[in-house]
From Swiss-Prot:
The RuvA-RuvB-RuvC complex processes Holliday junction (HJ) DNA during genetic recombination and DNA repair. Endonuclease that resolves HJ intermediates. Cleaves cruciform DNA by making single-stranded nicks across the HJ at symmetrical positions within the homologous arms, yielding a 5'-phosphate and a 3'-hydroxyl group; requires a central core of homology in the junction. The consensus cleavage sequence is 5'-(A/T)TT(C/G)-3'. Cleavage occurs on the 3'-side of the TT dinucleotide at the point of strand exchange. It comes from Pseudoalteromonas atlantica (strain T6c / ATCC BAA-1087). GO terms for cellular component: cytoplasm; Holliday junction resolvase complex. Binds 2 Mg(2+) ion per subunit. CDD domains: RuvC (cd16962). The keyword Cytoplasm applies. This is Crossover junction endodeoxyribonuclease RuvC. Mg(2+) 1 binds at residues 8, 139. Belongs to the RuvC family. Its EC number is 3.1.21.10. It is found in: Cytoplasm. The keyword DNA-binding applies. The gene is ruvC. Pfam families: RuvC.
Length: 173
């Protein structure tokens, strides 16, 4: 059993999603948004760090995954997003968690089966996979998708490592 915390970073709103994986089953544990107050960047980064640190203490995840920075049209937005990611990553690292990073395309491919999926398709699949009673907010759904992507990727890595261990003289055993 593993608890996975997924993060969809943002300098104004950071989404989080927590799932538990037991075998091939994924169970929803929680999701929501950390909403930053104020206009100054430094206090907002502190709020992200504090919020993610609190989530780690609350849910005690075994794994931490975060979405990578995408290329924004506005360079200033990309820099702020990178700093928001940094605050979340340091919070995870500070608690001894390894950090896995996935591109938006990888996340969409893993959850929807299409790397060019629309946000509404991601929300629908997250709701379906986790059997949620309603559709989560966009940022929370994205964070749950990050956690699901890590769950799927980690499961495949475990399967592959199991196959490697079973290979003897070029044959699967």
């Amino acid at each position: 059993m593993a608890i996975i915390l997924g993060i969809d970073p943002g300098s104004r709103i950071t989404g989080y999603g927590v799932i538990q994986r037991a075998g091939r089953q994924q169970q929803y544990l929680g999701s929501g948004c950390i909403r930053m107050q104020g206009d100054a960047l430094a206090p907002r980064l502190q709020q992200i760090f504090d919020g993610v640190s609190q989530l780690i203490l609350q849910y005690k995840p075994d794994m931490f995954a975060i979405e990578q920075v995408f290329m924004a049209k506005n360079p200033d937005s990309a820099l702020k997003l990178g700093q928001a990611r940094g605050a979340a990553i340091v919070a995870a690292s500070n608690q001894g968690l390894d950090v896995a990073e996935y591109s938006a395309r990888q996340i969409k491919q893993s959850v929807v089966g299409n790397g060019n999926a629309q946000k509404s398709q991601v929300q629908h699949m997250v709701t379906f996979i986790l059997k949620l009673p309603g559709t989560p907010q966009a940022d929370a759904a994205d964070a749950l998708a990050v956690a699901l992507c890590h769950s799927h990727t980690n499961e495949n890595l475990i399967k592959m490592s199991g196959q490697v261990k079973k290979t003897v003289r070029g044959r699967l055993r």
